[in-house]
């Protein structure tokens, strides 16, 4: 009866409000179980329909033998149960494979995980993308915690643990992000081994209102799918010995260090399936589909994921390929329009042939789906495949050195020397050639603007609404095809080689045959509003895609917004268009290899095609098929509006940092001078050069330039005079010296000891890098570094303040604003020539010299860099953006020897009078680089000093060379980087710097915090992908006190020590000085933050929860509002009760007898 009263209704409303204030708690019961997993349950290659016995490479992975495990492995996996009895498992979609269940939550929710470990060894559960306290981090590392805050790090066999993860607003998808962000959870005792053992699953964090409150499923899309692309390295699994014993027919014959055995255990999988064996995700035409994609793994886990048949939008941009790396998480959104069975593949050559393929099925669930309407222009192309004799160096000499390409001892001689068992620089190749009509009797003569295309096929262009009719004549001697990215085509024009129940004559065009492909450009493949006017794609032959593209069959394709193209096909508002393909043409994979050996080697029968040096000589590091500056046609005028269309192709070593010397490019609202390219990825960038001269464009991945992947572009004044001296404002002067030091990568060795102590079953991966033995140098090396001095006397080194302690090996952090000029007084105090040059800024010798002048030992030289507007942040950039400065005397050796530093350019008004930023509380610059000491100038010195041996007689074994590859952050390994300390509720900017070789793929993960990074808009992440030649500012609001792990998520890099900690101090504890409290096993920089079991006196409790100052304010506001509502409810209830009593008294008076006696 009470609840029917008005006061009761108000109380119900009050309780409802309490329910709104409290978050939805999403509870999961997860069990870790051991099981046997079959990577190919259908027992055949589903893509081709063939038996594995017909594929030599497939048998390597899948066939059992005396020393081969085969396709079935014991693994540990996460499983979802109904309740705490763990007796009833909740089934999951079959396409999810061995991944754990999909966990979902909205911003404001709380995720509670009850984890039960049914496995035979300890494991844990660590999330990305959500908030957690120390007792729910689920990650084992020396962080100075103990007791309850350490119990979460590992759950022993037969035990359980409860993790609590609030999904706070700070982890919410940014406005420009998809409605649900893709994250993962995984075991984190030894993360690489745990993940390879199978313990990983998806976690989706959604904006408020996206999930159904009762079912927990999404309401904003029709379908959602999750796919993990990774090379599952079963050699790293905790169960390797079990698998050898169980599945090898002669376990005693197994050599676990054998390279072929190890390769046989590397499974190139989608959710744990190979060769199309993944159960097909199914959807209907017209449905909205969200694809949640992520990568995991090692240095070779570079994945270019291609969705055949349909395009999608990711981070506001149209594409049909996305790149994934270890711990890269992406959400792509697709409106499905093309019915049929379509492939999902990794287009990295090695991964494609090793089985990283799947399929998805699109049905006509509502009857026959009409083709998307197109009413634009019909554009016709007549393209032939022809066999050609190609010269990678047609001018015969290196444009950068002036020496002949076959000069003995030169870098180029490896590729251009013809000999008994060497082909040299000329090869038979295949090439797409354009003809004028369908008779294919007369080639279309290329214009001057197309002279740079080289081996590339003709540029195909179309606007939205157009129809492309491409008549293909195979005038070569192999079966070929044309398969395009980025356009719409039905099965009649499908050139993909998969068996899907359709006759596809365009997939196999034999020599002498022709076929006409019909491609359309409907609105569904149009560039988005965020995209440039023209999207860059490529087309290629897909009969045997690795052989065909290695032979040369590739060309550029542009999809443009309506009204973008002139009548002659050129782009409106663009004066020059250039198309550059960066790839290592691996002639060893070309279908013409045997013919090239026969024609060009002097003794063909002596050639061993497996010989490492022979194989190396055929890997041609080219731009459009040209090497060492031999590409013609890269010329333009000053002030020209230039569009660069950049394309990648190849294998897992084809990670290219394309660098434009002397100018910057405009890329999605940002200013850069370099960008990263990967196989089958293409990018459009813009440039407006402001100085005439000659400049380099090259791949800054360290070995690639020395191997020939560099060209020269020329800018002529064309009547536009260079300003004699631009009106630059403040002159910022720095006194910098190059000097030699004895450097210790790991002065404190406790990190690895402590990790092994915490995990008694763990391995010591750091010994080879830190131990000084008879044949290992250890952690100390002679190096050369940049150091700042107080004045031009170069006597007193300028002391670094505490906020720069983290720079360590790096040179000083140089700041400048747009409009400034930087004057470097440089003294070479080292023993060999060096220089100092910078990316992003304008050198005083800009365009006059290809190479920066060097400074000899003992000399002093002056270098001047100007900061024009194009060198500062772009419209979408943060207030300050990073570049690097370095020595160019010998870029590769100088870098590995230690010469590198950060240069920060800012918008006007950002720097204070001391040259420091006034808009943030802290800034940190981090260089992630595998310092290859084998390439250092000082290797011989280090052998002499630390091994006491003669370098001429010392044998360089594989182990010795591996021991000299220091996986460092600012020159420190295994938790030795100090100075990453900040206070709670502070705004921090981190400048992430990528330099190095093909192994320098770095995915930087911040535990406990997320951050925003900007391209055209801001996006939320907790891992950032970093590559050679790329630099990025990330914005991190530090609001979670504690000492947290910061590391590269690449498996080998974790084991090699590329990890450290950063500390967020509570506001009440910011009086604690740097480097004062050291947890056991950590480096001297670690700071212990008071445990939440002993909170500070200024904290506030709300329903038993310890809150920090900002949270306390919010809690007080909520308490005030609730108190006010309770007061109102109480008053209303009291008034209602009082009114009820009066009515009751009145009724009693009415029913009593009147006092008639008184009458």
Curated annotation (Swiss-Prot):
Residues 1136-1159 are cytoplasmic. Its cofactor is Cu cation. Cu cation 3 binds at residues 188, 1007, 1047. Cu cation 5 binds at residues 656, 699, 704, 709. It is an enzyme of class 1 (oxidoreductase). Residues 24-206, 217-365, 378-560, 570-718, 730-906, 914-1092 form the Plastocyanin-like domain. Its EC number is 1.16.3.1. GO terms for biological process: copper ion transport; intracellular iron ion homeostasis; multicellular organismal-level iron ion homeostasis. GO terms for cellular component: membrane. SUPFAM superfamilies: Cupredoxins. The chain crosses the membrane at residues 1115-1135. InterPro entries: Cu-oxidase-like_N, Cu-oxidase_C, Cu-oxidase_fam, Cu_oxidase_CS, Cu_oxidase_Cu_BS, Cupredoxin. It is found in: Membrane. It comes from the Eukaryota. Cu cation 1 binds at residues 126, 1005. Cu cation 4 binds at residues 303, 346, 351. Disruption phenotype: HEPHL1 knockdown mice exhibit short and curled whiskers. Its main location: membrane. Residues 24-1114 are extracellular. It is linked to Defects in HEPHL1 are the cause of the curly whiskers phenotype (cw). Curly whiskers mice carry a recessive mutation that alters splicing and causes omission of exon 11 from the mature transcript. The cw phenotype is characterized by kinky, brittle vibrissae. Belongs to the multicopper oxidase family. This is Ferroxidase HEPHL1. It comes from Mus musculus (Mouse).
